């Protein structure tokens, strides 16, 4: 049956750019990729995009801990994430970042439209403030007990146990993540998105029948409890986009994160030189289909805030949300101590990607059910299904075809009715892929594999091969087996991309969905090479042990400069702004009589002279060598009276001390008096 080609935009939830991809993440990306690959096989135009979610407090905090800028950290993390997804053959058309110019422009556009349409409200709120650090505490700077389900150790914006959202002030017994202090209340003006104005629209969207039943039921609970205005602003310090005309106020990460879907697609369109498609996919009356694959922990944001934001800013809403559950390993939550918190990169050091893709696919359905990765069952299932049923079907027939018939298949099918049984299954299997009933699709395919192997067992080509005058029968039987293998691999192509490549090389033909209607008759195949190797529990044991070792390494004491000289307590931007750093020319440098540590420096600030005592003598035994150098000094440090005179500032140097002191110098071109910003 010929299908009308559709235009489809598919996204996965944006991985947060402060940690590595693990097997929990991979469930979603594999699920989406299998669905996308099936859609492409059916001739649809699919754009599959993702990006790193690169803003927010956790990223800012982790970058501080690492002693690098947030920009540097998210850049390195993006490369790591893309390498992992490529390793699992996730076929993204584009992978971008929310920290991009496209995302900034779209975030500001959506905000301005919401504001123009009256959906942004300003009001002063009482906000938690850290009295020890002298700073307002954004959501992720606060932890406490969830006000809804009473789960402890939850962040200040949403509960990771029950999924509820709330303000940090609603937490029970809140504590500052930064200092551990009990926060106090301070007033601050914030911006709110008027979500209740969209209640009627959202309820109609819920009743449309498109959403999964479990999602629709959960949304109904939220409607019954009443929708609240949503705080979309955060106070500095915050890593993100500053709100236009609101100095010191930033878009909350959950405002610009879903806009990252649009930003990544805009980036893709720009790369293609296609200025039309973005509007075709995102305009209000778009006929393109838009699907978000997400985990059940972020349904609230995607089912309420996101469609309301789009509606209020005159963009189209998603066609549907495809929500999945969590991953457990061996029946329990992934555990670092047990070695079952497994990173994607660690997996690929021990197993191929197709094995996990197959196992997850075999267990997935359209429901929001958790998936258990039982490692022993994983080994048994991959060996039983991929190796014994599918690959073995090719290997047990290919030898005879290659050796006895120079790789040429028979000109007629030995059992046309059996072949028709296989091709007739395309409708049921295709519908299962389409509706995300992946487990059902795999069961149907494996049932066919059993039929194919039973046919070969009954025909016993190894016996026929020894009988005189039965060459034609042998060729027909083995050709039938190879044709059935071709159909099976075509059905499995969305799941097993690397095995498919090897199968296509052997079969000497591309596997296409419609192509199976015509069997390979009189066709020459290539010499058979091993398509897939068996796996065993020793590999699992090595994988688990490697994961444990990674945890130990991550928990090991910091070595190097940070171990001896850890990063100081966090300061606010206002604190830092008080320090006036200037470029200074060293006009003179000399020993200080009576001191074996100090040098007396005469500094020129471009019109003003300063006398500074600096404890760098051990590193610079010849002070004359410093004369004429430019350095950096703290110019507004209060003068300090010393035994040898008054020191009118401080020069900047790095290093642990002793002979390992390194005076800082600006790049060529900096002039005395220039401010360091």
Curated annotation (Swiss-Prot):
InterPro entries: aa-tRNA-synth_I_CS, Anticodon_Met, Met-tRNA-synth_bsu_C, Met-tRNA_ligase_1, Met-tRNA_synth, Methionyl/Leucyl_tRNA_Synth, MetRS_core, MetRS_Zn. One of its GO terms (cellular component) is cytosol. It comes from the Bacteria. It catalyses: tRNA(Met) + L-methionine + ATP = L-methionyl-tRNA(Met) + AMP + diphosphate. ATP binds at residue 336. A motif ('KMSKS' region) lies at residues 333-337. It is found in: Cytoplasm. A motif ('HIGH' region) lies at residues 15-25. Binds 1 zinc ion per subunit. Belongs to the class-I aminoacyl-tRNA synthetase family. MetG type 1 subfamily. This is Methionine--tRNA ligase. It comes from Escherichia coli O6:K15:H31 (strain 536 / UPEC).
